[in-house]
Protein backbone atom coordinates (compact mmCIF):
# COMPACT_ATOMS: atom_id res chain seq x y z
CA UNK A 1 0.00 0.00 0.00
CA UNK A 2 1.25 3.50 -0.85
CA UNK A 3 3.06 5.33 1.98
CA UNK A 4 1.26 8.30 3.54
CA UNK A 5 4.07 10.67 2.55
CA UNK A 6 3.72 9.61 -1.09
CA UNK A 7 -0.03 10.21 -0.92
CA UNK A 8 0.58 13.68 0.54
CA UNK A 9 2.93 14.49 -2.34
CA UNK A 10 0.30 13.32 -4.81
CA UNK A 11 -2.42 15.37 -3.10
CA UNK A 12 -0.24 18.45 -3.45
CA UNK A 13 0.17 17.89 -7.18
CA UNK A 14 -1.84 20.57 -9.02
CA UNK A 15 -2.58 18.13 -11.86
CA UNK A 16 -4.37 15.63 -9.57
CA UNK A 17 -7.59 14.40 -11.22
CA UNK A 18 -10.91 13.96 -9.42
CA UNK A 19 -10.83 10.23 -10.17
CA UNK A 20 -7.39 9.83 -8.63
CA UNK A 21 -8.49 11.92 -5.63
CA UNK A 22 -11.32 9.46 -4.95
CA UNK A 23 -8.87 6.56 -5.18
CA UNK A 24 -6.51 8.21 -2.70
CA UNK A 25 -9.36 8.90 -0.27
CA UNK A 26 -10.35 5.24 -0.42
CA UNK A 27 -6.76 4.16 0.24
CA UNK A 28 -6.51 6.51 3.20
CA UNK A 29 -9.73 5.24 4.77
CA UNK A 30 -8.49 1.66 4.39
CA UNK A 31 -5.34 2.68 6.25
CA UNK A 32 -7.44 3.86 9.21
CA UNK A 33 -9.46 0.63 9.17
CA UNK A 34 -6.29 -1.48 9.32
CA UNK A 35 -4.85 0.63 12.14
CA UNK A 36 -1.85 1.70 10.08
CA UNK A 37 0.55 3.76 12.23
CA UNK A 38 1.07 7.42 11.31
CA UNK A 39 2.92 10.21 13.08
CA UNK A 40 1.09 13.34 14.26
CA UNK A 41 3.23 15.40 11.89
CA UNK A 42 2.23 13.29 8.90
CA UNK A 43 -1.39 13.36 10.02
CA UNK A 44 -1.38 17.16 10.14
CA UNK A 45 0.21 17.36 6.68
CA UNK A 46 -2.27 14.82 5.36
CA UNK A 47 -5.33 16.64 6.73
CA UNK A 48 -3.99 19.94 5.42
CA UNK A 49 -3.39 18.51 1.93
CA UNK A 50 -6.83 16.89 1.88
CA UNK A 51 -8.46 20.12 3.10
CA UNK A 52 -7.36 22.03 0.01
CA UNK A 53 -9.56 19.63 -2.01
CA UNK A 54 -12.64 19.94 0.24
CA UNK A 55 -14.18 22.71 -1.91
CA UNK A 56 -13.93 22.76 -5.68
CA UNK A 57 -11.75 25.58 -7.06
CA UNK A 58 -14.24 26.54 -9.79
CA UNK A 59 -16.99 29.15 -9.80
CA UNK A 60 -19.63 26.78 -8.40
CA UNK A 61 -19.30 25.82 -4.75
CA UNK A 62 -19.06 22.03 -4.71
CA UNK A 63 -18.26 20.30 -1.42
CA UNK A 64 -16.25 17.09 -1.78
CA UNK A 65 -17.93 14.81 0.76
CA UNK A 66 -15.45 12.03 0.00
CA UNK A 67 -12.60 14.25 1.16
CA UNK A 68 -14.51 15.43 4.25
CA UNK A 69 -15.31 11.85 5.21
CA UNK A 70 -11.64 10.91 4.92
CA UNK A 71 -10.56 13.89 7.05
CA UNK A 72 -13.15 12.93 9.65
CA UNK A 73 -11.75 9.38 9.72
CA UNK A 74 -8.35 10.72 10.74
CA UNK A 75 -9.74 13.07 13.38
CA UNK A 76 -11.78 10.21 14.85
CA UNK A 77 -8.90 7.72 14.94
CA UNK A 78 -6.71 10.08 16.93
CA UNK A 79 -9.03 11.98 19.26
CA UNK A 80 -6.35 12.47 21.90
CA UNK A 81 -4.31 14.55 19.44
CA UNK A 82 -7.27 16.60 18.16
CA UNK A 83 -6.26 19.83 19.88
CA UNK A 84 -2.64 19.59 18.77
CA UNK A 85 -3.66 18.90 15.16
CA UNK A 86 -6.11 21.82 15.14
CA UNK A 87 -3.51 24.16 16.63
CA UNK A 88 -1.02 23.35 13.86
CA UNK A 89 -3.69 23.62 11.13
CA UNK A 90 -4.72 27.05 12.42
CA UNK A 91 -1.09 28.20 12.41
CA UNK A 92 -0.84 27.06 8.77
CA UNK A 93 -4.07 28.87 7.83
CA UNK A 94 -3.43 32.26 9.40
CA UNK A 95 -0.68 33.38 6.98
CA UNK A 96 -3.06 32.56 4.09
CA UNK A 97 -5.85 34.83 5.37
CA UNK A 98 -6.59 38.18 3.79
CA UNK A 99 -5.55 40.81 6.31
CA UNK A 100 -7.67 43.83 5.59
CA UNK A 101 -9.68 44.47 8.76
CA UNK A 102 -8.25 44.71 12.25
CA UNK A 103 -10.37 44.13 15.36
CA UNK A 104 -10.52 47.92 15.85
CA UNK A 105 -11.87 48.39 12.32
CA UNK A 106 -14.49 45.71 12.97
CA UNK A 107 -15.72 47.61 16.03
CA UNK A 108 -15.95 50.74 13.92
CA UNK A 109 -17.85 48.87 11.20
CA UNK A 110 -20.56 47.86 13.66
CA UNK A 111 -21.71 51.47 13.45
CA UNK A 112 -23.78 50.96 10.33
CA UNK A 113 -23.99 54.64 9.39
CA UNK A 114 -22.62 55.64 6.00
CA UNK A 115 -19.05 56.92 6.26
CA UNK A 116 -17.67 57.03 2.74
CA UNK A 117 -13.90 57.34 2.40
CA UNK A 118 -12.61 58.43 -0.98
CA UNK A 119 -10.34 55.87 -2.62
CA UNK A 120 -10.83 53.13 0.00
CA UNK A 121 -12.79 50.85 -2.32
CA UNK A 122 -10.05 50.89 -4.96
CA UNK A 123 -7.40 50.29 -2.31
CA UNK A 124 -9.28 47.29 -0.92
CA UNK A 125 -9.91 45.89 -4.40
CA UNK A 126 -6.19 46.08 -5.11
CA UNK A 127 -5.46 44.28 -1.83
CA UNK A 128 -7.93 41.56 -2.79
CA UNK A 129 -6.46 41.11 -6.26
CA UNK A 130 -2.96 40.84 -4.81
CA UNK A 131 -4.18 38.27 -2.27
CA UNK A 132 -5.83 36.18 -5.01
CA UNK A 133 -2.76 36.35 -7.27
CA UNK A 134 -0.63 35.06 -4.38
CA UNK A 135 -2.86 31.99 -3.97
CA UNK A 136 -5.02 33.32 -1.16
CA UNK A 137 -8.11 31.42 -2.34
CA UNK A 138 -6.29 28.21 -1.45
CA UNK A 139 -6.82 29.00 2.23
CA UNK A 140 -10.64 29.03 2.06
CA UNK A 141 -11.08 25.21 1.91
CA UNK A 142 -8.65 24.83 4.84
CA UNK A 143 -10.60 27.52 6.74
CA UNK A 144 -13.78 25.55 6.02
CA UNK A 145 -12.36 22.27 7.37
CA UNK A 146 -11.05 23.98 10.52
CA UNK A 147 -14.51 25.46 11.22
CA UNK A 148 -16.09 22.03 10.72
CA UNK A 149 -13.85 20.52 13.40
CA UNK A 150 -13.45 23.44 15.81
CA UNK A 151 -14.89 22.57 19.21
CA UNK A 152 -17.29 24.89 20.98
CA UNK A 153 -14.91 25.42 23.88
CA UNK A 154 -12.27 26.78 21.48
CA UNK A 155 -14.42 29.42 19.79
CA UNK A 156 -13.72 32.33 22.11
CA UNK A 157 -9.94 31.94 21.87
CA UNK A 158 -10.08 31.90 18.06
CA UNK A 159 -12.72 34.55 17.31
CA UNK A 160 -10.02 37.21 17.00
CA UNK A 161 -8.91 35.74 13.65
CA UNK A 162 -12.08 33.87 12.57
CA UNK A 163 -14.38 36.92 12.42
CA UNK A 164 -11.96 39.24 10.55
CA UNK A 165 -11.09 36.33 8.28
CA UNK A 166 -14.72 35.76 7.31
CA UNK A 167 -15.63 39.46 7.06
CA UNK A 168 -12.67 40.26 4.83
CA UNK A 169 -13.88 37.62 2.37
CA UNK A 170 -17.53 38.71 2.69
CA UNK A 171 -16.60 42.32 1.91
CA UNK A 172 -15.12 41.43 -1.48
CA UNK A 173 -16.54 43.31 -4.46
CA UNK A 174 -14.35 41.78 -7.17
CA UNK A 175 -15.77 38.24 -7.51
CA UNK A 176 -19.12 37.33 -5.98
CA UNK A 177 -19.13 33.60 -6.78
CA UNK A 178 -15.50 32.62 -6.21
CA UNK A 179 -14.79 34.84 -3.20
CA UNK A 180 -17.75 36.59 -1.53
CA UNK A 181 -20.05 33.56 -1.65
CA UNK A 182 -17.35 31.38 -0.11
CA UNK A 183 -17.31 33.86 2.76
CA UNK A 184 -21.02 33.15 3.21
CA UNK A 185 -20.26 29.41 3.26
CA UNK A 186 -17.65 29.97 5.98
CA UNK A 187 -20.17 31.97 8.04
CA UNK A 188 -22.78 29.25 7.59
CA UNK A 189 -20.27 26.65 8.75
CA UNK A 190 -19.32 28.73 11.80
CA UNK A 191 -22.99 29.05 12.76
CA UNK A 192 -24.03 25.46 12.08
CA UNK A 193 -20.99 23.51 13.27
CA UNK A 194 -19.76 25.55 16.21
CA UNK A 195 -22.36 27.86 17.73
CA UNK A 196 -25.19 25.34 17.31
CA UNK A 197 -23.24 22.68 19.23
CA UNK A 198 -23.78 22.50 22.98
CA UNK A 199 -26.26 25.36 22.70
CA UNK A 200 -27.60 24.92 26.24
CA UNK A 201 -24.20 25.14 27.91
CA UNK A 202 -23.91 28.67 29.29
CA UNK A 203 -20.18 28.39 30.01
CA UNK A 204 -19.39 28.78 26.29
CA UNK A 205 -19.67 32.09 24.45
CA UNK A 206 -23.03 32.67 22.73
CA UNK A 207 -23.20 34.19 19.26
CA UNK A 208 -25.60 36.89 20.48
CA UNK A 209 -22.91 38.18 22.87
CA UNK A 210 -20.51 38.93 20.00
CA UNK A 211 -22.60 41.87 18.73
CA UNK A 212 -21.95 40.80 15.14
CA UNK A 213 -25.53 40.00 14.15
CA UNK A 214 -26.38 43.37 12.48
CA UNK A 215 -23.15 43.30 10.49
CA UNK A 216 -23.69 39.82 9.10
CA UNK A 217 -27.43 40.29 8.55
CA UNK A 218 -26.90 43.46 6.52
CA UNK A 219 -24.39 41.75 4.22
CA UNK A 220 -26.57 38.67 3.70
CA UNK A 221 -29.80 40.60 3.13
CA UNK A 222 -28.09 42.79 0.53
CA UNK A 223 -27.11 39.65 -1.38
CA UNK A 224 -30.79 38.66 -1.61
CA UNK A 225 -31.27 41.59 -4.00
CA UNK A 226 -28.75 40.32 -6.56
CA UNK A 227 -31.53 39.89 -9.12
CA UNK A 228 -31.89 39.96 -12.91
CA UNK A 229 -31.38 41.90 -15.07
CA UNK A 230 -28.35 43.14 -13.09
CA UNK A 231 -27.32 39.53 -12.51
CA UNK A 232 -27.72 36.38 -14.56
CA UNK A 233 -30.56 34.18 -13.25
CA UNK A 234 -28.24 31.17 -12.84
CA UNK A 235 -25.83 33.33 -10.86
CA UNK A 236 -28.67 34.60 -8.67
CA UNK A 237 -29.92 31.11 -7.83
CA UNK A 238 -26.37 29.97 -7.00
CA UNK A 239 -26.06 32.90 -4.58
CA UNK A 240 -29.45 32.31 -2.96
CA UNK A 241 -28.79 28.60 -2.38
CA UNK A 242 -25.98 29.55 -0.02
CA UNK A 243 -27.29 32.87 1.35
CA UNK A 244 -30.87 31.91 2.27
CA UNK A 245 -29.97 28.93 4.51
CA UNK A 246 -27.24 31.05 6.12
CA UNK A 247 -29.77 33.77 6.99
CA UNK A 248 -32.01 31.19 8.66
CA UNK A 249 -29.04 29.82 10.63
CA UNK A 250 -28.07 33.36 11.65
CA UNK A 251 -31.56 34.01 13.04
CA UNK A 252 -31.65 30.67 14.83
CA UNK A 253 -28.30 31.19 16.56
CA UNK A 254 -28.79 34.89 17.39
CA UNK A 255 -32.27 34.37 18.87
CA UNK A 256 -31.67 30.99 20.45
CA UNK A 257 -33.36 32.08 23.68
CA UNK A 258 -35.89 34.47 22.18
CA UNK A 259 -38.49 32.62 20.11
CA UNK A 260 -40.56 35.77 19.54
CA UNK A 261 -37.67 37.63 17.91
CA UNK A 262 -36.74 34.56 15.88
CA UNK A 263 -40.28 34.38 14.51
CA UNK A 264 -40.31 38.13 13.86
CA UNK A 265 -37.17 38.00 11.71
CA UNK A 266 -38.43 34.98 9.75
CA UNK A 267 -41.67 36.87 9.17
CA UNK A 268 -39.79 39.98 8.04
CA UNK A 269 -37.62 37.97 5.65
CA UNK A 270 -40.66 36.28 4.12
CA UNK A 271 -42.58 39.53 3.76
CA UNK A 272 -39.88 41.93 2.55
CA UNK A 273 -37.62 39.63 0.55
CA UNK A 274 -39.82 36.89 -0.88
CA UNK A 275 -43.35 38.28 -1.11
CA UNK A 276 -42.62 41.94 -1.84
CA UNK A 277 -39.54 41.56 -4.03
CA UNK A 278 -38.55 38.18 -5.40
CA UNK A 279 -41.85 36.69 -6.56
CA UNK A 280 -43.24 39.94 -8.05
CA UNK A 281 -39.96 40.59 -9.90
CA UNK A 282 -39.18 37.04 -10.98
CA UNK A 283 -42.74 35.85 -11.64
CA UNK A 284 -42.76 33.58 -14.72
CA UNK A 285 -39.91 35.44 -16.41
CA UNK A 286 -37.37 33.57 -14.27
CA UNK A 287 -38.93 30.21 -13.46
CA UNK A 288 -35.98 28.81 -11.50
CA UNK A 289 -35.91 31.84 -9.19
CA UNK A 290 -39.64 31.67 -8.50
CA UNK A 291 -39.46 27.91 -7.90
CA UNK A 292 -36.71 28.41 -5.33
CA UNK A 293 -38.60 31.29 -3.70
CA UNK A 294 -41.70 29.11 -3.38
CA UNK A 295 -39.63 26.28 -1.88
CA UNK A 296 -38.23 28.73 0.69
CA UNK A 297 -41.76 29.96 1.34
CA UNK A 298 -42.86 26.44 2.25
CA UNK A 299 -39.85 25.99 4.55
CA UNK A 300 -40.63 29.21 6.42
CA UNK A 301 -44.33 28.33 6.67
CA UNK A 302 -43.35 25.02 8.30
CA UNK A 303 -40.97 26.79 10.69
CA UNK A 304 -43.56 29.39 11.69
CA UNK A 305 -46.48 26.96 11.92
CA UNK A 306 -49.50 28.88 13.31
CA UNK A 307 -47.47 32.10 13.11
CA UNK A 308 -47.72 31.82 9.32
CA UNK A 309 -51.16 33.37 9.58
CA UNK A 310 -49.53 36.81 9.26
CA UNK A 311 -48.64 35.93 5.65
CA UNK A 312 -51.99 34.39 4.72
CA UNK A 313 -53.66 37.31 2.96
CA UNK A 314 -50.49 38.61 1.31
CA UNK A 315 -49.39 35.18 0.12
CA UNK A 316 -52.77 34.44 -1.46
CA UNK A 317 -52.61 37.77 -3.28
CA UNK A 318 -49.01 37.28 -4.50
CA UNK A 319 -49.68 33.75 -5.78
CA UNK A 320 -52.78 34.91 -7.61
CA UNK A 321 -51.48 38.19 -8.98
CA UNK A 322 -47.97 37.20 -10.10
CA UNK A 323 -48.28 33.50 -10.90
CA UNK A 324 -51.77 32.06 -11.36
CA UNK A 325 -53.17 35.02 -13.34
CA UNK A 326 -50.23 35.06 -15.74
CA UNK A 327 -51.47 34.06 -19.23
CA UNK A 328 -48.46 31.73 -19.66
CA UNK A 329 -48.98 29.97 -16.31
CA UNK A 330 -49.96 26.62 -17.84
CA UNK A 331 -46.72 26.38 -19.83
CA UNK A 332 -44.79 25.93 -16.56
CA UNK A 333 -45.88 22.57 -15.06
CA UNK A 334 -43.21 22.67 -12.33
CA UNK A 335 -44.46 26.08 -11.24
CA UNK A 336 -48.07 24.86 -11.19
CA UNK A 337 -47.09 21.95 -8.96
CA UNK A 338 -45.03 24.12 -6.63
CA UNK A 339 -47.80 26.73 -6.35
CA UNK A 340 -50.32 24.07 -5.35
CA UNK A 341 -47.81 22.72 -2.83
CA UNK A 342 -47.50 26.17 -1.25
CA UNK A 343 -51.30 26.45 -1.01
CA UNK A 344 -51.50 22.99 0.62
CA UNK A 345 -48.76 23.89 3.11
CA UNK A 346 -50.50 27.15 3.96
CA UNK A 347 -53.75 25.29 4.67
CA UNK A 348 -51.96 22.73 6.87
CA UNK A 349 -50.04 25.17 9.08
CA UNK A 350 -52.48 28.06 9.56
CA UNK A 351 -55.25 27.96 12.18
CA UNK A 352 -58.50 26.57 10.76
CA UNK A 353 -60.52 29.66 11.59
CA UNK A 354 -58.25 31.85 9.46
CA UNK A 355 -58.37 29.40 6.57
CA UNK A 356 -62.17 29.45 6.82
CA UNK A 357 -62.12 33.25 6.62
CA UNK A 358 -60.16 33.06 3.34
CA UNK A 359 -61.70 29.84 2.01
CA UNK A 360 -63.11 31.34 -1.17
CA UNK A 361 -59.82 33.08 -2.05
CA UNK A 362 -57.95 29.80 -1.61
CA UNK A 363 -60.59 27.87 -3.54
CA UNK A 364 -60.27 30.40 -6.38
CA UNK A 365 -56.53 29.69 -6.70
CA UNK A 366 -57.25 25.98 -7.06
CA UNK A 367 -60.19 26.40 -9.44
CA UNK A 368 -58.40 28.87 -11.71
CA UNK A 369 -55.35 26.59 -11.85
CA UNK A 370 -57.48 23.57 -12.70
CA UNK A 371 -59.64 25.44 -15.21
CA UNK A 372 -56.68 27.00 -17.04
CA UNK A 373 -54.89 23.66 -17.30
CA UNK A 374 -58.06 21.93 -18.46
CA UNK A 375 -58.90 24.55 -21.09
CA UNK A 376 -55.32 24.74 -22.42
CA UNK A 377 -54.59 20.99 -22.59
CA UNK A 378 -52.09 21.21 -19.76
CA UNK A 379 -53.98 19.05 -17.25
CA UNK A 380 -52.05 15.88 -16.52
CA UNK A 381 -52.77 13.25 -13.89
CA UNK A 382 -50.27 14.71 -11.44
CA UNK A 383 -51.75 18.23 -11.52
CA UNK A 384 -55.29 16.87 -11.31
CA UNK A 385 -54.37 14.83 -8.25
CA UNK A 386 -52.71 17.83 -6.60
CA UNK A 387 -55.78 19.99 -7.20
CA UNK A 388 -58.01 17.32 -5.64
CA UNK A 389 -55.71 16.87 -2.64
CA UNK A 390 -55.55 20.62 -2.03
CA UNK A 391 -59.34 20.87 -2.08
CA UNK A 392 -59.49 17.94 0.36
CA UNK A 393 -57.17 19.77 2.76
CA UNK A 394 -59.40 22.83 2.46
CA UNK A 395 -62.54 20.80 3.21
CA UNK A 396 -60.85 19.28 6.28
CA UNK A 397 -60.85 22.76 7.82
CA UNK A 398 -64.66 22.67 8.17
CA UNK A 399 -65.06 25.38 5.57
CA UNK A 400 -68.82 24.87 5.17
CA UNK A 401 -68.80 25.24 1.40
CA UNK A 402 -71.07 22.29 0.65
CA UNK A 403 -73.63 24.29 -1.30
CA UNK A 404 -71.05 26.12 -3.43
CA UNK A 405 -69.06 22.96 -4.16
CA UNK A 406 -72.21 21.07 -5.05
CA UNK A 407 -73.07 23.74 -7.61
CA UNK A 408 -69.52 23.68 -9.03
CA UNK A 409 -69.45 19.89 -9.27
CA UNK A 410 -72.50 19.96 -11.55
CA UNK A 411 -70.75 22.17 -14.07
CA UNK A 412 -69.22 20.05 -16.87
CA UNK A 413 -65.92 21.95 -16.74
CA UNK A 414 -65.39 21.04 -13.05
CA UNK A 415 -66.91 17.55 -12.87
CA UNK A 416 -63.56 15.77 -13.13
CA UNK A 417 -62.13 17.86 -10.28
CA UNK A 418 -64.86 16.77 -7.87
CA UNK A 419 -64.79 13.07 -8.71
CA UNK A 420 -63.26 11.86 -5.45
CA UNK A 421 -62.54 8.15 -5.14
Swiss-Prot record:
Which keywords, in A-to-Z order, does the entry hold?
A: Chromatin regulator, Cytoplasm, Nucleus
Write out the GO cellular component annotations.
cytoplasm; nucleus; TTT Hsp90 cochaperone complex
Domain of life assignment:
Eukaryota
Family annotation (InterPro entries): Tti2
- What is annotated about its quaternary structure and interactions? Component of the ASTRA chromatin remodeling machinery complex composed of at least RVB1, RVB2, TRA1, TEL2, TT1 and TTI2. Component of the TTT complex composed of TEL2, TTI1 and TTI2. Interacts with TEL2 and TTI1.
Q: Its function?
A: Component of the ASTRA complex probably in chromatin remodeling.
Q: Tell me its family.
A: Belongs to the TTI2 family.
The remark listed among the other comments is: Present with 1470 molecules/cell in log phase SD medium.
Protein's recorded name: TEL2-interacting protein 2
| Organism listed in the record | Saccharomyces cerevisiae (strain ATCC 204508 / S288c)
Query: Its gene?
Result: TTI2
Amino acid sequence: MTAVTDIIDELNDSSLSSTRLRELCLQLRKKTDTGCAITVSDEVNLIESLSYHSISPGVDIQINTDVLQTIDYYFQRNKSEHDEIMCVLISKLQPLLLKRKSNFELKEQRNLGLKPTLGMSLKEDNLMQAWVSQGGLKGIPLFYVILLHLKRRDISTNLSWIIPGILNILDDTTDIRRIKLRGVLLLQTLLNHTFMNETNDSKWIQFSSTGLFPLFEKTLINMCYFLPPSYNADETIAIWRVVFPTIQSLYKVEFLDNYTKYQYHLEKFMSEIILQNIIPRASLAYENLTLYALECTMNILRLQREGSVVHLQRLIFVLGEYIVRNPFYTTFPKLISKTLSVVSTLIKVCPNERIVAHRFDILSLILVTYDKCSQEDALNESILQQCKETISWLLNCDCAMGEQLSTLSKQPRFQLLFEFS
